[in-house]
Amino acid sequence: MQLEFIAHATFLLRLDSGRSIVIDPYKAHEFNGRFDYPTFAPLCDFAVITHEHIDHAWLGDLRGNPVVVRQAWCDRELRISSVFAYHDAFGGTKFGGYVLMKVIEADGQRLCHLGDVGEPLSDAQIAALGHCDVAIVPIGGFYTIDAHAAHALATRLAARTTIPCHFKTPLCTLPSADATPFLRLAGTYTHLPHATYPIDSLPPGIVLLDDAFNP
C-alpha cells in the first residue's frame, strides 16, 4: 500500500492491485477564501468518509464512480472498519456531531485515519483502533483535538508512524494552529517532501508530509 498526502485531511492510497482509495475528499475554495486548496479530481475506486463536513466529504469532483464507504467494507483484498468518536469534547454539540474514525487494512498493512476527532479517546476506542502501521492524526485544534491532545493520543496509539493533518497552512487559514506546536512537543520528527510513499518505507515516529499544494 502506498500513501500520498493531498491536503488538509485528504489522503490517496494505492493498493498493490492498482485500486485506489481517497480518504476525506474536500471541496475546493470554500469558507470565504479561508480554505483555498485547488480542486482535487482523482480517478479512484473508493471514497472513504469519516464525517459529513464539506472539507471531508465532497464527492462531486471524484472520477471513476467510486464506492463510497461511510461505515465498513470488506473483500478479499481490503477491509475498512469504523470507530465512533465525537467531533468535540462536548458530546458533539459544538462542531456537528460525530466522526467515524477509519481503520484500513490491505497489503499486510494497517492504517487508521482519525478524521476530525475532538475528544480524548477511551481505552475501548484505542483498543478498537488497534495497532496500526500508520496513524493519521489531526493536530490543529479548534475544530479538532489540539497539539497537546494529539501528542498524547499519538503516544497512546503507538503506531509505527504518525502523520499529522488538519492544521493551518498558507492555503488553509481557518482558526486552527499550524504544525509548529505539535512538532515542538514531538521533539524529533522527519519532514518529507510531497510524494507517494510505500507505507512500509516511511520512517518510524512522527512524519510531517508536505501536501500537494503548499511549497
Predicted regions mapped to residue ranges:
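Zn-dependent metallo-beta-lactamase
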Residues: 1-17, 27, 34, 79-83, ...
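Pre-active-site segment of Zn-dependent metallo-hydrolases
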Residues: 12-48, 56-70, 84-97, 117-128
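Active-site-proximal loop/helix segments of hydrolase catalytic cores
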Residues: 90-157
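Metallo-beta-lactamase
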Residues: 59-108, 185-203, 209-210
